Amino acid sequence: MLAVIALVGVFVVRLVDIQVVQASVLNEASAQKRSIPVTIYGTRGAIVDRNGTELADSVTRYNITTSPRLVKQFKGKLGGTRIKDVSVSTALDALAKASGGDVATMRKNIAANPKSDFAYLIKGLDVRHYEAVVDLGIPWIYKEQQASRVYPTAATTGNLTGFMGTDGAQAGLEYAYDQCLAGTNGSETYERGEDGVQLPGSTVTTKKAKDGGTLETTIDSDLQYMAQQTIASAAKTLQAESATATVTSVKTGELLAVADYPTVDPNDVDATTDKGAFGSRALTASYEPGSTIKAAIAAALIDQGKSTPTDQAVVPYSRTFPWGGTIHDSEFHPTENLTLTGILQNSSNVGITELGARLTAQQRFDYMKKFGLFEPETAIDYPGQPSMDYGTSPNWDQQTNINSMFGQGISTTAVQVASVFQTIANDGVRIPLHFVKGCTTADGKTIDAPDVQKQRVVSAAAATQVTDMLQSVVTGGTLVGMKPISGYNIAAKTGTAEVAEGSQGYGGQRITSVAGMAPAEDPQYVVTVTFTKPQTNKWSSGAAPAFRTLMSQVLEKYRVAPSASEAKLYPSTW
């Protein structure tokens, strides 16, 4: 009897311990077993063009998960068909067929920890495949919702947008504006019974998710496509290593197109073998610009009152300096009597250095900086831009001081060359080039708007005279072979730059380019095209057809009124 009483006493003490002393601890442990945490993903914001067309967006994708300890044969229906006993093997086969998943992978994930409450079966299902999986009615599978990144314009804008990787933003605008685009994840919990089914009304939100902002660009995706196709076709014809094209609105400084070849498709990054294509070369690839820079030197000369379009110079084929350095023009010619206009028209290295020497090295350096050279684009936030830390003085040796006047020994990007021509086209006023308007956050605030303060670089008179001189390049100079654009006066400058090969100096490779504006009497748009290491035509004449095609497309697309008068031409010789 005493033994029975003692045994009852033990049970009573244990019962009190469980129900009173340890009650809160055990309840919490039980709740934790039933309580399932779920991440609520904040949607990453879209990147859109100037018209709202999505360049990058987030779409809903679904992961299918399970609780391995609950995976077992079940009774009922499978996909609407009544089956007495649905085996695990039959269920997984049906799941693989509906989703496109791999049965072996599912089995492996379940077997990895068969007593656990969580394992992935399939990841990244679109809505159609997800609904097919749900229709199967398998009781021990669950959904996990997440956002996936898609790029509707694919390779057309891929070099600009960049892309996302498994560990976040990897390149381009995705990387530069990640802080605004990124959403903030939230969380919630729900309770489920022993059968793994969620208990109705048990969901509790512990942290609200917040969507990312929308990044609005100035890019016109239709024009971007035209530009990309134009340079891709030309680059293949020229057998060029790479190519870029830019289109700029003169009056706003907005870049309407920044195209590259080769391209990257952010929807399938692994297919891109050229890792240099992960960014936009128009912004990241520095090169010696060659003769396009002569337009800036001419503008500086006129602005300082050191020359006029009809100023006279005696121009031999070559010129040797006291320190032993020599320069020459691209093609042999007898000594010529050229005006400043003729020097630009014929792209004479010797001629531009003779007149350019009327400015000090510091003056020329200062003008180049005002035009937007020698520093990263201040209104563009983009990874990989060269630092170009030239300081406040040229620090050039004697030969570079001369060569810089025809674009050798200095570095630029294609967008910086576009900036020079935007300034000249805009009556001498530079507007920092940019292709982002700003990022609108989920609560409606606009952030990351670029600083586009205008700066006068040269007088309106100087800019107009240079524009008029550049028409001679098209009508009778290095672009004379380019088919005219009917009804429009075009002002442009060519560039054929040698490619430095380390300590070996300049070799046989070239970078060819054309930069120009239209209509010349009231420029609205600037177009640049650049080809790196072309093989079938190593002169700027090879770049001319692409420039003409793209400029024609721009003028037609934006319905620019034709020129009302003939081109104003200065004499090129005396």
Locate each region found by the language model.
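Short beta->alpha transition motifs characteristic of CBS
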Residues: 58-70, 257-263
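Short extracytoplasmic
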Residues: 35-60
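Small/polar-residue-rich segments within soluble enzyme cores
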Residues: 65-66, 70, 90-97, 104-212, ...
